[in-house]
Amino acid sequence: MLRKLLFGGVTWLALCALAPDQAVAQRIASSDSLAVAAAVAAATQQYVQQAQPESVLFNGPEYVNRNPPSTIGHQYFGSADPQLGTITYRNAQFRGILLSYDLALDQVVMTYPSQAVTVQLVPEKIGGFSLGNHQFVRLLADSVAKSQAPTGFYEVLLAGPVSLLARHTKRVQQTTVQQNLRLEFRQTDQLFVRTASTMAPVDNLKDVLNLLPTHKAEVQRYARQQQLRFSGAQREASFSSALRYYASLPQ
């Protein structure tokens, strides 16, 4: 009997001792759950606020695609569908935004999630944007002395003191096939080299060498040794390789 009482007492004391710990653990778990829920709610609210019609992003005219449905291809960069991207707009950065880049109009378009609402963002308010791994900046024609580049958006292919950029455009080409008018989007990609003093289009190695202030012979020799090809599919990679080598030389 004594053994039973002692055992029962120990058991009861143990339960009493554990009860506060379990209560504390429950309170901690509940607190953690509330913290996680609050964080998720805050993140969701932040995105919704960024993408709501009254947001700073919805501060431009409605975008309307006026191209005939029969036109072959599309006018956008990469994909005809909106892509998740990041944009710097009115000195604020917005992530995870549905964006399209109309190459025919040189216009960035935002799509409101789950709604058929598209807005043209004001170009002058855009500092830059990204679509996937592609980074774009907006440059003014007079932002660089002796610039031969028009105002607009440029893809940054290589950043640095001497940078390589691409100006992508699309135009509708009209042809007649068996007495029927054929409309098709065609893309043009013009490369530019930007230095501290100028920005100009480049089509071959000679164009690049004319823009470099120093090390022209070294870059020319490197291009010959590496068998760089400044045309066709290897064009962008070859220009980037030559400029990376130039940047590695003592200035």
Residue positions per predicted region:
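General N-terminal leader/first-domain-start detector
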Residues: 2-3, 11, 23-93
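C-terminal segment of classical bacterial N-terminal signal peptides
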Residues: 15-23
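Aromatic-patch recognition
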Residues: 77-206
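A short, ordered amphipathic alpha-helix with a cationic face
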Residues: 73, 195, 208-213
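Long, compositionally biased interface segments
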Residues: 210-251
